[in-house]
Amino acid sequence: MMTEQVVYLNGQFVPLSQASVSVLDRGFIFGDGIYEVIPVYQRKMFRPQQHLERLTRSLASVGIDNIYSNEQWLQIIANLMEKSEGSDLLVYIQVTRGVAKRAHAFPLNTKPTVFIMVNAMSGPSKEMRERGVACVTMQDMRWLHCDIKSTSLLGNVLAAQNAAQHSALETIQFRDGFLTEASSSNVWIVKNQTLLGPQKNNLVLEGIRYGLFEELCAKHEIPFEMRAIAQDEVFSADEVLLSSATKEILP
């Protein structure tokens, strides 16, 4: 008999069925929160410090207190992983501004709601890695702070649904004729043996694999450049790649 999944909520490890938050939590009312996702391979977290640094940046950018140090986050996650089954896992962290009377402006003296869960991660199939995946395109209609890993993801949800309705894995988005990113992935192109990626700015979320791509290209002497990439360049690319915590790197 399988034991019930255990999650972390506001300082307590509790069964998932017993975890609950107020309906007045600003994450529920406004999507006023930040999240982070850390992949785990063979029970070892992938670049945890970089993920936690991004969490810290996103929290600071919207004025939500980060109530834990990186060391405390890592200890909580390690404790939760001990209560979780499996070898390859996905750690989901969510921090909202907390519970307050409904009003748009930031409330005073609220305590952030902290939620963490660990789920099994299967990763892309061998066929997906070898044959590639289907993508569709659309105009990027999201807000102008996509560099913040916000829980307000309706634009991303609509883009993902657009892909699902066309039997594709992802929707690659363009803003004003230039590549931004997919619904939940960064997008890269290969042209003339050079790896190209969009510039790091407010229109894209800087995936943790940005740094990995830079390191691998430097190590293997592969030309690498980050710049504005026109839509026509994507359609004429020698190869298009997706990268994310769950998709890893996919053609």
Indicate residue ranges for each PLM-predicted region.
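Conserved alpha/beta cores of soluble small-molecule-handling proteins
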Residues: 1-171, 175-178, 201, 210, ...
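Glycine- and Gly-Pro-enriched alpha-helical subdomains that act as flexible
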Residues: 178-200, 206
